[in-house]
Structures are given as structure tokens and as C-alpha cells.
Swiss-Prot record:
<keyword id="KW-0819">tRNA processing</keyword>
<dbReference type="GO" id="GO:0043528">
    <property type="term" value="C:tRNA (m2G10) methyltransferase complex"/>
</dbReference>
<keyword id="KW-0007">Acetylation</keyword>
<keyword id="KW-0808">Transferase</keyword>
<dbReference type="GO" id="GO:0000049">
    <property type="term" value="F:tRNA binding"/>
</dbReference>
<dbReference type="InterPro" id="IPR016691">
    <property type="entry name" value="tRNA_mtfrase_TRM11"/>
</dbReference>
<keyword id="KW-0694">RNA-binding</keyword>
<comment type="subunit">
    <text>Part of the heterodimeric TRMT11-TRM112 methyltransferase complex; this complex forms an active tRNA methyltransferase, where TRMT112 acts as an activator of the catalytic subunit TRMT11.</text>
</comment>
<dbReference type="GO" id="GO:0160102">
    <property type="term" value="F:tRNA (guanine(10)-N2)-methyltransferase activity"/>
</dbReference>
<dbReference type="GO" id="GO:0005737">
    <property type="term" value="C:cytoplasm"/>
</dbReference>
<keyword id="KW-0949">S-adenosyl-L-methionine</keyword>
<keyword id="KW-0489">Methyltransferase</keyword>
<dbReference type="Pfam" id="PF01170">
    <property type="entry name" value="UPF0020"/>
</dbReference>
<dbReference type="InterPro" id="IPR002052">
    <property type="entry name" value="DNA_methylase_N6_adenine_CS"/>
</dbReference>
<keyword id="KW-0963">Cytoplasm</keyword>
<protein>
    <recommendedName>
        <fullName>tRNA (guanine(10)-N(2))-methyltransferase TRMT11</fullName>
        <ecNumber>2.1.1.214</ecNumber>
    </recommendedName>
</protein>
<dbReference type="InterPro" id="IPR029063">
    <property type="entry name" value="SAM-dependent_MTases_sf"/>
</dbReference>
Length: 463
């Protein structure tokens, strides 16, 4: 199975988590760094091995400086479904492309990576020795080699049915590792200021990558909470700001979410979190504000809006308002006045969110947000839509047997011009999602049913 020598073909070794999020991340990042996604496989599916065509090694390295979904990247020299096919593929790879990394003044080592199977040391040595036909002239250096080469073997996805021989074998030159270490270094467990629903660090970086966040961008979170999403964007050099209706959260007051701590400390706030990671210079501000009544002037100024709206489960969905028929004008309220809040229906929340994004995003800017769904009733028609926004990706993360949340990425493709017309279109389109206004009740009804079933099974087991 020879590979065409004219193509810059690379092998991505992907992490086996958040599977649906991987392809949109890679596509988004390639478009940011000047590459275009062109695949060499019909489908990627759940496989950790992806073959891509990337224009240059510089673009490939820049991709790995951003991705948290990929573990490693290799310049692919050959691959096949058997050792014989691999060797034939390697022999057809242009020698002039190998020589710069195999000459006598170089040092190297060869590593073995297997997916879904463990090899003995003897089996590993046998595989390395079989590559003696390659023109290696340099010296082996296992500690600090100039070049690292890898044999990668794919034994499929089923741990209960591991084949004797691999489905695919790859050989390539290691280029770079991804940014998986960010998940640990930015872990919520180590963060100074956290809340009940602080976003997982890995997902925060995935959202920033889906949003194509880059240096000097202006990124906004209208449901900022404890600011976890701002941290990921600031890490990539974007200036960040946000709003939230909860005064205590914005100002770092009230009860703490951390175990064995009753009240928040004097310096527990979003700014302190960015300071913790050396990112304070990217912090603009966070404001107490109601997302249903944006206080921003008209215009397009956000490069990305990244947010995780409340679902009504661990954080309430609220907006300012009153049940009274006659409302007091805001100019008559004292500065210390705290407005009455009402329930903020999910369908209204997402209607306001995408309308706000369509109005304030720059052309080409992206909106990335989580949409909670009750899976037995979910259809793609429920995903919010706007004439000015194009749906880029829709990825599912399961929350329970009956609920999930979907990471929605949209890109602004048209200027916001006719708000009245948009309002009418959006109201009609949001009818399918209005049933999810009772998402909280459906979520807990499923939990109640599960507990009842478990108790019944336990009772029957004792009889």
C-alpha cells in the first residue's frame, strides 16, 4: 500500500475521550493557522489513528500547539494492514525525504505504540529489528535523540475481542505532542476560585478551539459564573470579559463551593483566577448584568462568545423582572436596589443568546455554547437557528441515561440588519425546543425512576 510521495501526509494519534468533539476541533484549528482540512480517510469514527494531509510541517507543529484532543503527530512514512504491506509502503517512500533524519551525524530512537494490546519486550525488539532495511546511519540514543520514530499498531476498539494481528500498522517520524498537559495544569481542583458548575478544564480548551480563539481577540461570556471559560481563552492570548446576574459570584462573595470551606475568602474572584495562571493582563472586567436585557451599545465587537448557560439543575435560570403590571422606572430606583428576578425559560434564554450573538459578533466570529436536551425527545430541529449564523458543529456529551448537553458551534456569516424580521423567524423556529423549558423536571423525573428501579431490584434480590 504505497503512499504518494507528493503529499505531506501526517498521522494524528487522538485521545479517546470526547470523541464527537475531536473532528470539529481539528478542522477549526487548521482554519485558524492557515491550513485546510483535507482527509485521507473516508471516516474517522472512534479510531485514535487519523491520517491527514497538512500543507507543511510548520502548520502541523502549530496545530499541536493548540489541540487538546490529539496526543501526538507523526510524519507518516508508511502504513499497511500487515507487516509486509508496511514494509512495501516504506520502501516506496522517497529516500530523499528520509536522508535528512537518518544521516551519520544524527541520533535517533524507535518507539512502539500499541492501541488495545500490550506487547512483550521481546515482541517490541523483533518489530524494531525488522526495520533494518531502512537507511539508518546515525547512532541510537535512547535518552536525548535528535529524531524519534514510532511504530504504531491498531488492534481495534473492543477490549473483549483483541485480534492476534493488528488491523493497521503505521510508521512515522514524531513531530510534536498536543497540549493534553493543560488539562492537568488548569485543573479545577487546583483553581483558586470555583463554583458548583465550574467547567472542566479540558472542555474549556475544546470550546476555545471550536471558537477559533486567537491572540488579541475579544471574547465574551454572558453567563460567566466563576470564569472558567475565560481562562482558556486568555491562555491563547485573547482579552476576556463577561457578565452574570449573580452579584455574589461576580464579586466573589457568599458561601464557598469548596469542601470544608464555609465562606469565600477575600480574594476569591475571577480576576484572582487569571492572576493565578499569569493571565491577568488579558482580564478586562466582569459585570453584574441580565443576559435577557443586554446593556451593551449597538455594534459588532466580539470575536467569540463562549458560554455555558444555566440549566436549572445546579444553578437556577433567572432574569430580572416583576409580576406587577405597573413597573417602577429604573431611574427611580436607588443605586443599591437589587431587582426582583423571575424564572428565565430555557427557550427564551437561547433565543436571546443567539440573537445577541448575531448582533454583536464580528463577521466570521463564533458562538460556542452548551444546549441541554432530554434525549428521548431530542431532534436536530431543536437546535437554535438564526439567519445570520451558520451551524458549524453539534457534539453530544451524555449527562445521564436520559439527558445530555450538546456543544453547539455557530459562525456569523451575515450582518445583522432586520431585528423585527429575525424576531418573527426565531419565534417560529424555537417552538420545537419549548418543551425543554421543563428540563429540570424531566432531569429529576429520570433520576427518581432510576432510584425506584434500583430499590425494586435490590428488594427482589433479597427475596
Amino acid at each position: 500500500m504505497a503512499l504518494p510521495g507528493s503529499l505531506n501526509r501526517y498521522l494524528l494519534l487522538m485521545a479517546q475521550e470526547h470523541l464527537e468533539f475531536r473532528l470539529p476541533e481539528i478542522k477549526s484549528l487548521l482554519s485558524v493557522i492557515g491550513g485546510q482540512f483535507t482527509n485521507s480517510q473516508e471516516t474517522y469514527g472512534k479510531s485514535p489513528f487519523w491520517i491527514l494531509n497538512i500543507p507543511s510541517e510548520d502548520i502541523a507543529r502549530n496545530l499541536m500547539k493548540r489541540t487538546v484532543c490529539a496526543k501526538s503527530l507523526f510524519e507518516l512514512w508508511g502504513h499497511g494492514k500487515s507487516p509486509e504491506e508496511l514494509y512495501s509502503s516504506l520502501k516506496s517512500y522517497p529516500v530523499e525525504k528520509m536522508v535528512p533524519f537518518l544521516h551519520s551525524d544524527s541520533t535517533y530512537k524507535i518507539k512502539i505504540h500499541t492501541f488495545n494490546k500490550t506487547l512483550t519486550q521481546e515482541e517490541k525488539v523483533k518489530r524494531i529489528d525488522a526495520l533494518e532495511f531502512l537507511p539508518f546511519e546515525g547512532k541510537v540514543n535512547l535518552k536525548k535523540p535528535q529524531h524519534v520514530f514510532s511504530i504504531l499498531e491498531d488492534y481495534g476498539l473492543d477490549p473483549n475481542c483483541i485480534p492476534e494481528n493488528p488491523h493497521n500498522i503505521y510508521f512515522g517520524r514524531w513531530i510534536a505532542d498536543g497540549q493534553r498537559e493543560l488539562i492537568e495544569s488548569y485543573s479545577v481542583k487546583k483553581r483558586h476560585f470555583i463554583g458548583n458548575t465550574s467547567m472542566d478544564a479540558g472542555l474549556s480548551f475544546i470550546m476555545a478551539n471550536h471558537a477559533k480563539v486567537k491572540e488579541n481577540d475579544l471574547v465574551f461570556d454572558p453567563f460567566v459564573g466563576t470564569g472558567g471559560l475565560l481562562i482558556a481563552s486568555a491562555h491563547f492570548g485573547a482579552y476576556v470579559c463577561g457578565t452574570d446576574i449573580d452579584y455574589n459570584t461576580v464579586h466573589g462573595l457568599g458561601k464557598a463551593s469548596r469542601k470544608n470551606q464555609k465562606w469565600r475568602g477575600p480574594d476569591e474572584n475571577i480576576r484572582a483566577n487569571l492572576r493565578q495562571y499569569g493571565l491577568e493582563k488579558f482580564y478586562l472586567d466582569v459585570l453584574v448584568s441580565d443576559a435577557s436585557k443586554p446593556s451593551w451599545r449597538k455594534g459588532t465587537y466580539f470575536d467569540a462568545i463562549i458560554t455555558d448557560p444555566p440549566y436549572g439543575i445546579r444553578e437556577s435560570t433567572r432574569r430580572t423582572g416583576s409580576q406587577k403590571e405597573i413597573l417602577k422606572g429604573i431611574e427611580k430606583c436607588p443605586e443599591s436596589h437589587v431587582p426582583v428576578s423571575l424564572t428565565y425559560h430555557l427557550s427564551d434564554m437561547f433565543l436571546d443568546l443567539i440573537n445577541f450573538a448575531a448582533e454583536t459578533l464580528v463577521l466570521g466570529g463564533r458562538l460556542v455554547y452548551w444546549l441541554p436536551v432530554y434525549t428521548p425527545e431530542y431532534t436536530e430541529k431543536m437546535v437554535p437557528w438564526h439567519p445570520c449564523l451558520r451551524l458549524v458543529s453539534n457534539c453530544e456529551q451524555k449527562l445521564s441515561s436520559h439527558t445530555a448537553r450538546r456543544l453547539i458551534t455557530m459562525e456569523k456569516v451575515k450582518e445583522f440588519e432586520n431585528p423585527d424580521e429575525y424576531s418573527r423567524l426565531l419565534s417560529d423556529h424555537f417552538l420545537p425546543y419549548q418543551g425543554h423549558n421543563s428540563f429540570r423536571e424531566k432531569y429529576f423525573s429520570g433520576v427518581t425512576k432510576r432510584i425506584a428501579t434500583e430499590e425494586q431490584c435490590s428488594h427482589e434480590g433479597k427475596l
